[in-house]
């Protein structure tokens, strides 16, 4: 995955955007090297971004400024979100929010790019694929199938 140009580009879009949005809100921000996070049914490229917020910045300001990331909202943000609202026929609901915790001394969040909702005896699964210049439609559909199957695998385990 780390050698795949498309995966590297997707990851770079996200972490570069987050760092840009931290500017003005954080005293410092450090990005880790990309790593593979192996899970039972799928693997991810993972980077940690550790930031020390300015005293006048609260966690909610940070979250509002960062989300949605390009992983789920596209880039450039305003134009991409307008296009998503035009094209998608459904509400995204809980898909793609920040997942984590806030405490007095430290907070930690992740970009939640897959989610599921069990309601009224029905399971709704949400996932997406990064569409970039040069993306192959068949490969993107396969990626969606793989992601959904990994979620179903967790459900059945």
Language-model features, listed with the residues they occupy:
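Contiguous alpha-helical scaffold segments within structured protein domains
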Residues: 1-85, 156
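Glycine-rich, small/acidic residue-mixed loop/short-helix segments
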Residues: 73-79, 83-157
